[in-house]
Swiss-Prot record:
Part of a complex composed of FtsB, FtsL and FtsQ. Essential cell division protein. May link together the upstream cell division proteins, which are predominantly cytoplasmic, with the downstream cell division proteins, which are predominantly periplasmic. It comes from Aliivibrio salmonicida (strain LFI1238). HAMAP family: FtsB (MF_00599). The keyword Cell cycle applies. It holds the Pfam family DivIC. This is Cell division protein FtsB.
Amino acid sequence: MRAFAVLLIIALGWLQYTLWFGKNGMEDYAQVSNDVQLQEEVNQGLRNRNGQMFAEIDDLRKGSAAIEERARHELGMIKKGETFYRIIDENSEE
């Protein structure tokens, strides 16, 4: 009976060790949980960026205001009859 109790305590000790420090134990679980949370934050940022891009694509397909805005800011285009004024700061290095 005494040998059985010692064997049972050893088995329980081994099970506790593997639970806390072994492969797929609590330490690994905490690390994986942290990795999952970080990845979810990255994914949410990417979802937000995708939503903005889809909204911009939809705006470019349906309206001419977005196309005009891009032409003005990215390509420096102006409409007929408009005058373009460029104001340069005296402190600028250009």
